[in-house]
Amino acid sequence: EDVPQPPVSQFYIQGQVYCDTCRARFITELSEFIPGAGVRLQCKDGENGKVTFTEVGYTKAEGLYNMLIERDHKNEFCEITLISSSRKDCDEIPTEGWVKPSLKFVLNTVNGTTRTINPLGFLKKEVLPKCPQVFNKLGMYPPNM
């Protein structure tokens, strides 16, 4: 017999922020994780679109961030957005193409109490010299290099 569980009142959101050193718009072997980068979590009501929750977090070693959310955000849509980079050479927020500066998700107990979000990346101003070799290995043409 199933015993009803009390509602979960805490969630952890975790993810990573990286420097896209090849401006590939995805992680490559040359990508570097950024400690000290800022991200914002914002949740909105699924029916009226009003903001219900906002939290800012910063990455630690290996570009990891971890946020504690104090209640279940059922029927809400949440979004993690890049807000700041600790690296002046890698602080461009991507706005073009299929990569967005944020990730959207639904936060609920169906997926457990820890939610791992896909990595978000800042674009490096100048690509690394080894980037063409990385794209060649992947069988791809470099984007606008």
Curated annotation (Swiss-Prot):
Belongs to the Ole e I family. Glycans are attached at N111. Pfam families: Pollen_Ole_e_1. PROSITE patterns: OLEEI. This is Major pollen allergen Lig v 1. Keywords: Allergen, Disulfide bond, Glycoprotein, Secreted. It is found in: Secreted. Changing N66S: In Lig v 1.0102. One of its GO terms (cellular component) is extracellular space. Transmembrane segments: none annotated. Changing V127A: In Lig v 1.0102. Disulfide bonds join C19-C90, C22-C131, C43-C78.
